[in-house]
């Protein structure tokens, strides 16, 4: 059931954010968030300037990040694209947590991620 799957994905993402963990470049699709990794913004109380500053720091050069003990944020040129990106972050979170069950995943090099980021500018799904 789709809503059950979505709830599981959100739960996985929240596990990463509650541990203040970002997502390294274990998979090339991490680049869809705009960087070589997906950072996790430091925790601050909701609705505060401190939280806003922490999120902006984590988003620098990126389009999405996790937010410690909150969840995630994603932005794009349209609302529908922002939702697609948020879904991709959910999927990547699930893949990362799953891969950790087998041990530490192989991390792609910065040079490889630069290549991926360059190609990602023109990437269209579907």
Q: Model-predicted segments: where are they?
A:
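Single conserved hydrophobic/aromatic residue that forms the stacking wall/gate
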Residues: 1-12
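Short, structurally constrained coil/turn elements
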Residues: 4, 34, 58-60
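A generic secondary-structure signal marking the coil-to-beta-strand transition
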Residues: 8, 36-37, 63
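Beta-hairpin (beta-strand-turn-beta-strand) motif
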Residues: 9, 19, 69-70
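Class I SAM-dependent methyltransferase SAM-binding "motif I" and its flanking Rossmann-like core
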Residues: 13-46
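Short capping loops/turns at secondary-structure boundaries
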Residues: 19, 41-48, 65, 75-79
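Active-site glycine-rich loop that binds ribose-phosphate moieties when present
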Residues: 43-59
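A conserved C-terminal secondary-structure "cap"
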Residues: 54, 61-126
